[in-house]
């Protein structure tokens, strides 16, 4: 937990960001890949989440390449559908994509050439906490423990 004056932040999840590739992709069975090896692959960007877009751009910059989206979509459901149809590759939060991987239509690969994690925090803006706020924080902990 982090605290600054009256603002308190609690980490809900620390999650690996992977590269998601469709079944049949040349690296699908590799386990890990360098972003530079995928520089020419069409990239499916998730534009509906500003924070995930910032994380994505940081990951590509860390690997020394620019992110060029061939397709932009605003929902995870559409992004995963396009990916499983073989339309490109995507950055994926490992927990959120676990079910697709179990179905076999998508493979998650560790990224070798960049720091690839995301952290989600909940901030409490004052020390005053209602029963509803505590219940909501407990709900978030349960939710993120299932995907993390």
Where are these regions (language model features)?
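Short secondary-structure boundary segments
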Residues: 1-2, 23, 93-96, 120
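Short beta-strand-centered segments that line the small-molecule binding cleft or hinge
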Residues: 1-21, 58, 84-87, 107-109
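Short Pro/Gly-enriched coil loops immediately N-terminal to beta-strands
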Residues: 7-23, 31-39, 111-119
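Structured helix-beta-strand junction loops
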Residues: 15, 30, 40-41, 63, ...
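Residues embedded in well-ordered beta-strands
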Residues: 18-20, 26, 44, 89, ...
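Secondary-structure junction motif
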Residues: 27, 42-63, 129-137, 147
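Hydrophobic hinge/microswitch elements
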Residues: 49-107
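A late-sequence structural motif
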Residues: 107-148
